[in-house]
Amino acid sequence: MPSIQELIKGVKSTDRASLGRAITLIESNLPDHRELAQELLAELLPASGSAHRVGITGVPGVGKSTFIETLGTKLTGLGHRVAVLTVDPTSSRTGGSILGDKTRMASLANHPSAFVRPSPTSGELGGVNRMTRETMLICEAAGFDVVLVETVGVGQS
């Protein structure tokens, strides 16, 4: 894993690999990662807070992912930089996401002005995971001016 300073530099320059690694560090439950995650957040916090944040929720199959891909594509077409954070049910076997909403947003996920990141609920109730807020801050520090959060389907957490 790169150093915290390398991650900060990468996030601020919107390097997708650095952004993904930073989010993985923030979501990690490993004790060694907690202090590093706090250092990362402390450094990135001043560069966050200016994005529009929108949460999308609904029952499974209602079209949340389709709506988000359409909205995200429209927003990127208008010049916005869009981050999409999808929260999926957690696999009891692997601890990861089991639905993979990113696969349903392939066009948006490949757009140069968009970033799509699935995350598991990690057993949390309420539709998002315990680090969704911090993940939004990291995306804002990376320069995304719209952050869309797709909650786990109603009744799936």
Language model segments and positions:
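Residues at the beta-strand->loop junction immediately N-terminal to the Walker
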Residues: T57
